[in-house]
Amino acid sequence: MNGRRRWGLVAAMTGLLVIGSGVAGASATVAPITREGVFRIEGPNRYATAVEVSRAIAQPPQEVVYVASGTNYPDALAAGPAAARAKAPLLLVAPNAVSPEVIAELKRLEPSEIRIVGGPNAVSEDVAATLKEATGAEITRIAGDDRYETATLLGEGVTDPERIWVVSGESFADALAAGAAAAHDHSMIVLTRRDALPEVSAHKLVELAPAQVAVAGGNAAIAEATFQLVQDAAPGAQVSRVEGTDRYATAAAVAKTVWPRGSAVLFFASGVTYADALSGTPAAALSDAPILLTRADRHPAATIDARLALGSGTRITLGGASASFMESTAPEPIVGPAPEPTQSTPPGPSPTDDVNCSSFATQTEAQGWWESHGYSPGNDPHGLDGNGDGEVCESLPG
């Protein structure tokens, strides 16, 4: 049975009705963040940060809460726009464990339904059972045979979209900014390989026949031949590439493309790890705001340029200081950019090196390197995740 059939059966059993670009009965007990100024939403880890975002936008009872992996990005990439369309918070779990903060938040939210994104390798059946026991909610799993099909299943309910975003399914960076853009469009993201457009992704483009398709990322992420395949799958669409010289510049280009008149609110999140931007997407959508990417120690020049161009007075940083830089209220000077990592070369040692935890200065650096190369508790060739909880090199500071 393929992923689409699995989704249809689960939807029927839970009474879920998917219509238009949203979800019937989507919760009305969410609201944009009203605090103004320059501030940070953070917890001591990615799971707690997602909880703090949820607490900032959602009040009980919730009809739907989305749950995705905090350690395995492929299945989780497309969850942000889906949660945003449903006006639902998005919480994170480890593959085989749920943090006490997440359990407490789910109990506070009193959801009628929890939608788990990804298969049992991303979020185990034990975790699903724990969520059921803690909340009594109906549990729905949205999972295809691979990340590409999962992304298309997360797009169920999108009809007659003006624009669809196509991003790499082999790295997470461009999907972070594109997720907020897709949420603005009440649309979805479709995943592709660099050198081939998966059949399930092509079928989704054919099925929805959007007026526009935006391909986020440069040739290092999505090859020109694949760009042509996207055009072939959407012959009636205006297909364009939105790119920059690196992930930060691409995120800036996405924001300036979708919000040409600026935005009253800007969100900032790490460009090295995916979790904070993912769980922040529903909050950004409620504020109709882009997500710009940053480093731990500074804003890249492209991020500063976008912030100045978009002209926001309220700037919300997702995650702690060890992950994401937060500027002061004073304007920052624009200085020449330092060398930036490209999508094809994540920062840190080469995967072929003899890598261990001593190769990194901080836990955040190690975690970002590990995730950038697509590693997970079940795929950890360097043994950085000793206890299999998805958090690597936990003895390192920060």
Task: Label the model's feature ranges.
Residues 1-4, 354:
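Actinobacteria-biased recognition of intrinsically disordered, low-complexity terminal regions
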Residues 3-10, 16, 24-347:
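Extracellular glycan-binding segments that recognize GlcNAc-based cell-wall polysaccharides
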Residues 343-387, 394-398:
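Calcium-binding acidic motifs and repeat modules
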